[in-house]
């Protein structure tokens, strides 16, 4: 950068003279000044010319074009707990991955780890964006050639949804509409949608099949069902391949210890039971709160189907591989067996080796007594079966990551490439 300021030691005879509010500069100084401007302009023009001659100047990013044999997957919410594990699995399977996340719940450091694991050009890119911004989403689709979308991005806490229902309808239902409209506009033909067993509500008959009536009882489940309805209505007159995965309670982490669950501290009261157990075991919280002991179950606490995140992302990859144009697949993703909250806590005590203090509290709004899946359809049609079905072992895997990451990922935006 050129400096056009005068030195302080300059003589008075070379200074501008002011008269009547006008400056009359020394002609020699004026010529020198103009010469510098011309030199700068010439150098700039030369640089631009040379840059344009570079073979890479007009070469589009590999992410912006389709390539034979390469499947480019947009993973929304890919900086989050489940989304990052899905991105890891896709990258291991040689997919090209673009992560889009607004980082309201996700962790940039998870993206950095993925970038370090797969540094080769054209493997992974991260785009900071909010799916509620339709213009930003359209720009992303315009600049990238996606073959499929895995839509994970969503707020996902039952308790929080009862406190802030409008937030959930905006974030889940409205944002899914934006994604679907943009996919249609840009000819992206495959959607794998991350849904939830919360769309079923509290069925009278267990286990839950895909034919079980959907009667959600909280805004989270209702918002997800609305999003499903939008997708299903659109698919009736579209050649899009659609897979909807309704999964149950997610636990565990990457068996190799690269990724884990690191929710924001302010969301602890709404978080998963595994996170609450680990917080109590590490002394972050004084104990574990069990909300509700008067449900109509064997021990009075809620019964849930706990699915390991490794099995869950395996189901997503199989769904992607099996997706067919003009077809909609709807699948429950669970183990097929339920465990009570008390049983879960006992497994957590064994996994951590800590005698966790338990406080029993009244029920949490929007919860239901018993939910577990019948996974026979996904087993038959996608050849998928949960392999990590031992609660204690899944919790031990997650606990190892927690012990090594006492502050979560503990990294900032300066540590990751953001586009």
From Swiss-Prot:
Needed cofactors: NAD(+)
According to its record, what are the GO cellular component terms?
Answer: Golgi apparatus; Golgi cisterna membrane; Golgi trans cisterna
Q: What is this protein called?
A: UDP-arabinose 4-epimerase 1
List residues in topological domain: Lumenal: 52-419
The coiled-coil regions, if any, are: none
Asked if the keyword Transmembrane belongs to this entry, the reply reads yes
* Stretches assigned to the Cytoplasmic side: 1-32
Q: What keywords would UniProt list here?
A: Carbohydrate metabolism, Golgi apparatus, Isomerase, Membrane, NAD, Signal-anchor, Transmembrane, Transmembrane helix
Q: What is its main location?
A: Golgi
Q: What is known about the tissue distribution of this protein?
A: High expression in roots. Also found in leaves, stems, flowers, and siliques.
State the organism's lineage.
Answer: Eukaryota, Viridiplantae, Streptophyta, Embryophyta, Tracheophyta
Active-site residue numbers: 220 (proton acceptor)
Question: Known Gene3D superfamilies for this protein?
Answer: NAD(P)-binding Rossmann-like Domain, UDP-galactose 4-epimerase, domain 1
| Bilayer topology | Single-pass type II membrane protein
Reactions performed catalytically: UDP-beta-L-arabinopyranose = UDP-alpha-D-xylose
Q: Which organism is it from?
A: Arabidopsis thaliana (Mouse-ear cress)
E.C. code: 5.1.3.5
Query: Is Membrane among this UniProt entry's keywords?
Result: yes
Example of a GO biological process term: arabinose biosynthetic process
What the protein does comes down to: Acts as a UDP-D-xylose 4-epimerase but lacks both UDP-D-glucose and UDP-D-glucuronic acid 4-epimerase activities in vitro.
């Amino acid at each position: 950068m050129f400096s056009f300021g005068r030195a302080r030691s300059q003589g008075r005879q070379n200074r501008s003279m002011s008269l009547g509010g006008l400056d009359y500069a020394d002609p020699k100084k004026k010529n020198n000044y103009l010469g510098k401007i011309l030199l700068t302009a010439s150098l700039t023009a030369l640089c631009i010319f040379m840059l344009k001659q570079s073979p890479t100047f007009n070469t589009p990013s590999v992410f912006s074009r389709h390539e034979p044999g390469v499947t480019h997957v947009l993973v929304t919410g890919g900086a989050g707990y489940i989304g990052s594990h899905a991105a890891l699995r896709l990258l291991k399977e040689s997919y090209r991955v673009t992560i889009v996340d607004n980082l309201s719940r996700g962790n940039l450091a998870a993206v950095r780890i993925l970038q370090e694991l797969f540094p080769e050009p054209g493997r992974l890119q991260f785009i900071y964006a909010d799916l509620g911004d339709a213009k930003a989403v359209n720009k992303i689709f315009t600049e990238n050639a996606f073959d499929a979308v895995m839509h994970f991005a969503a707020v996902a806490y039952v308790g929080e949804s009862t406190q802030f229902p409008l937030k959930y309808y905006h974030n889940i239902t409205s944002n899914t509409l934006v994604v679907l409209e943009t996919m249609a506009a840009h000819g992206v033909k495959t959607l794998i949608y991350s849904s939830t067993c919360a769309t079923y509500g509290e069925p009278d008959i267990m286990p839950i099949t895909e034919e079980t009536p959907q009667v959600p009882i909280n805004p989270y489940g209702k918002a997800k069902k609305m999003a499903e309805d939008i997708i299903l209505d659109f698919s009736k007159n579209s050649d899009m391949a659609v897979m909807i995965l309704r999964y149950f309670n997610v636990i565990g982490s990457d068996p190799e210890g690269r990724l884990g669950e690191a929710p924001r501290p302010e969301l602890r009261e709404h978080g998963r039971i595994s996170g609450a157990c680990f917080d109590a075991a590490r002394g972050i919280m004084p104990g574990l709160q069990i909300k509700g002991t008067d449900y109509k179950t064997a021990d009075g606490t809620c019964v849930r189907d706990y699915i390991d995140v490794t099995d869950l992302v395996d189901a997503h990859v199989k769904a992607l591989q099996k997706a067919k144009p003009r077809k909609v697949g709807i699948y429950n993703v669970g183990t097929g067996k339920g465990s009570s909250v008390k049983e879960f806590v006992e497994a957590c005590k064994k996994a951590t080796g800590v005698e966790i203090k338990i406080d029993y509290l009244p029920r949490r709004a929007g919860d239901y007594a018993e939910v577990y899946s019948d996974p026979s359809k996904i087993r038959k049609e996608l050849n998928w079966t949960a392999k990590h079905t031992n609660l204690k072992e899944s919790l031990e895997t997650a606990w190892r990551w927690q012990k090594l990451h006492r502050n979560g990922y503990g990294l900032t935006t300066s540590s990751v490439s953001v586009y």
